[in-house]
Amino acid sequence: MLERITRSITSASIFLAAYFLLNIALRIALPHTLDLDEAEQSFYSQYLLAGYGPQPPFYNWIQYAIVSVTGISMWVLSVPKNIILFGCYLFYGLAAREVLKSRSLAALAMLSLITLPQVGLMAQRELTHTVALLFATSLFLFGFFRTLRQPTIGSYLLIGIATGIGLISKYNFAILPFAALIAVLPEREWRSRLIDWRLLPAAVLAILIVLPHALWLPDNLASASAPTLERMTAEHLAPAGLPRIGQGLLSLVIAVLGFVALPIVLIAAAFRRDFFRALSSSSPMIRVIERMMVISLLAFVGVVLFAGASDIHERWLDPCLLVLLIYLFLKLETADIDLSAGLARFRPVVPVFMVVILSILLFRIVGIQYIGTYTRTNVPFSGYVAELTATRKPVLIVAGTKFIAGNMRLQFPDVPVVIPFFPGPGVPEYADAKGPVLVIWRGETADDPTISPGFANDLVKSGIHLPELKTLTLPYLFGDGKRSFSIGYSWVEGGAK
């Protein structure tokens, strides 16, 4: 059966589609409390903006377009994410088919994406903008390899579309087209692709896609870059100078190993001696891919040396190293050895990973009393809503964080949910509110309902004065009853008379 599934991209895609349907069903069955990225999407889906803060807006635009038609729900948050992630796998398979002669190897390369922790597990757990980045990276690889093999106006435009989408999905995507451009230069047979007239409309298309956000960026550079720079520099952990450079280079090495180790070990274990014999094989396409990965990683070395980055995360390497599995299978195919035994050993890895990932996604929520680590999805928002609205319903909700705001938006799909000073000054909706307004926040820790000075100050600046601060504490969902999560809240009357 597994051999039939991996016979072509079509059969493998059907198998993958069934897997993603199971992921959707599992998310719908689990508590409808949103994790941080989901909550941000829920909150941001009220607005169509050129920029939203530290993350580029592509995923937000997609989510806004869907929510504006269907309304907010758990389905609307889960289904688009899984479709985009499925698209990542599909275009990766199509990219593999451009460089691999064997249709079976291309299908297996596509399915093998699940062995990359950042793709198989982390993208399903909590990430959204990274899912868009993965999709754009696969789309770019497909257009890039198609252009090298058989250039058409369509393949060039595909590169332009992927580049535009990638740049407004995650800023680190910019490394990929730069690395691809440099990687092609030494290959005489493909160098002409870089001076082809069809590259111009591709560039124009990419610019048009990026333009709305690019016009927003200069006036909002601080809000767009500060959180990322803070995570990259980790100043509280690394002193300036050589110690910071050393920590940054070490974190880069650890991130690379964390990204590539598992699939390499699995493929090496399956193909055994054939894998090590294949490492010496080469071809023009192999050399291009090698240069792409090396140039991308050198760009991160430059970030460490010249931007002071000391904390490189694995997911930042997605556009640099996603091509790894195509590279490994291309090495095996180019070695011109019998791969049948290795393929038979490797095929079962994919369904095993599917079962393991679904089990992790389930057990991390329902088994927290055994694990001891409580997730945001275990916060009992439905219980809070039942308690808070037993006697009255809000006409407006003012939240202290995006986590609170997004979850309240899901619970009250017809009620505006706002955060002070986003997207503009104060809370203008308060002045027009006729009826009870719910102000709700959380503290620094799970059992701390203390209102933060910053949020309290923003409320005062917005003309909202809290008559009484109250606390609501409920046990975590699926917990042992001993651990709880607390929120603070206050009811005020709207400003409209």
Curated annotation (Swiss-Prot):
Keywords: Cell inner membrane, Cell membrane, Glycosyltransferase, Lipopolysaccharide biosynthesis, Membrane, Transferase, Transmembrane, Transmembrane helix. It is found in: Cell inner membrane. Belongs to the glycosyltransferase 83 family. It comes from Rhizobium johnstonii (strain DSM 114642 / LMG 32736 / 3841) (Rhizobium leguminosarum bv. viciae). Its main location: membrane. It is an enzyme of class 2 (transferase). InterPro entries: LipidA_mod_glycosyltrf_83, RgtA/B/C-like. Involved in the modification of the lipopolysaccharide (LPS) inner core. Catalyzes the transfer of a galacturonic acid (GalA) residue to the 4-position of mannose residue of the LPS inner core, using dodecaprenyl phosphate-GalA as the donor substrate. Seems to act after the other GalA transferases RgtA and RgtB. This is Lipopolysaccharide core galacturonosyltransferase RgtC. The chain crosses the membrane at residues 14-34, 74-94, 104-124, 127-147, 165-185, 199-219, 249-269, 292-312, 321-341, 348-368. The gene is rgtC. Pathway: Bacterial outer membrane biogenesis; LPS core biosynthesis. GO terms for biological process: lipopolysaccharide biosynthetic process; lipopolysaccharide core region biosynthetic process. Its EC number is 2.4.1.-. GO terms for cellular component: plasma membrane. It is a multi-pass membrane protein. One of its GO terms (molecular function) is pentosyltransferase activity. Disruption phenotype: Cells lacking this gene produce a normal lipid A structure with GalA at the 4'-position but a modified LPS core structure as this gene deletion results in elimination of the addition of GalA to the Man residue, but does not affect the addition of GalA to the 4- and 5-positions of outer Kdo. The mutant cells are also more resistant to the polycationic antimicrobial peptide PmxB.
